[in-house]
């Protein structure tokens, strides 16, 4: 069985894959020059718009932050950065795998693509663990529900992903062939076996382990929520039914967006080290390219999940009074013209002080209370 650099010898008929770098099989993948620019372009526009709106709510409308809102804020940041990394890839694939920019920019774009993808996965995991503790250990979750703990966890997540993705800057490079410059998604032939080993470690640490944690958390929560409460007669309360539906939706979105992408990418990389037929490799390569847009779509679906699953957050964002002018966030929002005028706020406060106090008391979470997603 041939392995290593020998696999890059020889040619067959077909269309060259920009990531293959002289690989012995030439894959038929003209479809990706339409699919990837179109899908990445849509994700870029929607992802930036939706996550920018979410960030505005977090920064300019919410007065009280806890662990849940902190994780959601960082999730929105990672999704927005992910969407912002797509325009150059749209241009690259629309030009037929031609990269007219520098090698350093190629490394940076690929690095940002995967860094923010895995940050999104880990922040979804943090939200799931936090919700699980709130359902299974509500008293203990009060201690860990403060924003200061969540900020430490968020910093650890960013540090972990940046450290794990740093080797990608070494592997990824560009090559010039036939007047075309390719920004590779893998590595040079002599480093490919090391790149596959690195990718498998990243798969285990940044996808498989978080996915297993999410499955366990939601299984435990579903079991607790489906348990009939003492003294109730038949059927689940409406709140519990909604929570169970939310669990199913989050799991479905996570599995739809991330699972196919990681499975096909792992098979694609692994099969290239084996002496398989080019037809088999072409099929798995096609599947891998098709699942790329699914992984990207998660940055558009996360903001929708915030508002579909968290009606309290929507009500809080709609009704809460903006922060006072003393806060840096409020000052920034005022400079951008995003806050209501001071005179309007003053008049509204004078005319409805009692009703405003009553409404704020109703919607502001108590200390340690979680905004459930």
From Swiss-Prot:
The chain crosses the membrane at residues 40-60, 71-91, 109-129, 153-173, 200-220, 244-264. Residues 1-39, 92-108, 174-199, 265-373 are extracellular. Its main location: membrane. One of its GO terms (biological process) is phospholipase C-activating G protein-coupled receptor signaling pathway. The keyword Membrane applies. Gene3D superfamilies: Rhodopsin 7-helix transmembrane proteins. InterPro entries: GPCR_Rhodpsn, GPCR_Rhodpsn_7TM, P2Y2_rcpt. Residues 61-70, 130-152, 221-243 are cytoplasmic. This is P2Y purinoceptor 2. It comes from Sus scrofa. The gene is P2RY2.
């Amino acid at each position: 069985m041939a392995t290593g650099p020998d696999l890059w010898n020889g040619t067959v008929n077909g269309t060259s894959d920009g990531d293959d770098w002289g690989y012995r099989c030439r894959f038929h993948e003209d479809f990706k020059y339409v699919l990837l620019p179109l899908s990445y372009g849509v994700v870029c526009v929607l992802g930036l718009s939706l996550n920018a709106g979410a960030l505005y709510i977090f920064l300019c409308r919410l007065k009280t932050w806890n662990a849940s809102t902190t994780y959601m804020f960082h999730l929105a940041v990672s999704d927005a950065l992910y969407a912002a990394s797509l325009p150059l890839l749209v241009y690259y694939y629309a030009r037929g795998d031609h990269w007219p920019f520098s090698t350093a920019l190629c490394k940076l774009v690929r690095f940002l693509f995967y860094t923010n993808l895995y940050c999104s996965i880990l922040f979804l995991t943090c939200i799931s663990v936090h919700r699980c503790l709130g359902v299974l250990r509500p008293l203990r979750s009060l201690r860990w529900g403060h924003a200061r703990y969540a900020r430490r966890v968020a910093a650890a997540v960013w540090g972990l992903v940046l450290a794990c993705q740093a080797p990608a800057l070494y592997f990824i490079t560009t090559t010039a062939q036939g007047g075309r410059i390719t920004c590779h998604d893998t590595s040079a032939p002599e480093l490919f076996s090391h790149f596959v080993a690195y990718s498998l470690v990243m798969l285990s640490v940044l996808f498989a382990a978080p996915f297993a944690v999410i499955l366990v958390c939601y299984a435990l929560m579903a079991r607790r929520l489906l348990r009939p409460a003492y003294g109730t007669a038949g059927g689940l309360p409406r709140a519990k039914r909604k929570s169970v539906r939310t669990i199913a939706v989050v799991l479905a979105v996570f599995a739809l967006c991330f699972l196919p992408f990681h499975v096909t990418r792992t098979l694609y990389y692994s099969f290239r080290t084996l002496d398989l037929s080019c037809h088999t490799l072409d099929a798995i390569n096609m599947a891998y390219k098709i699942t790329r847009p699914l992984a990207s779509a998660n940055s558009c679906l996360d903001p929708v999940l915030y508002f579909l699953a968290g009606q309290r957050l929507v009500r809080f964002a709609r009704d809460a009074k903006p922060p006072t002018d003393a806060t840096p966030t409020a000052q920034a929002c005022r400079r951008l013209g995003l806050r209501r005028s001071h005179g309007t706020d003053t008049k509204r406060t004078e005319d409805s002080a009692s009703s405003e106090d009553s409404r704020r008391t109703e919607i502001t979470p108590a200390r340690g209370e979680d905004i459930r997603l």
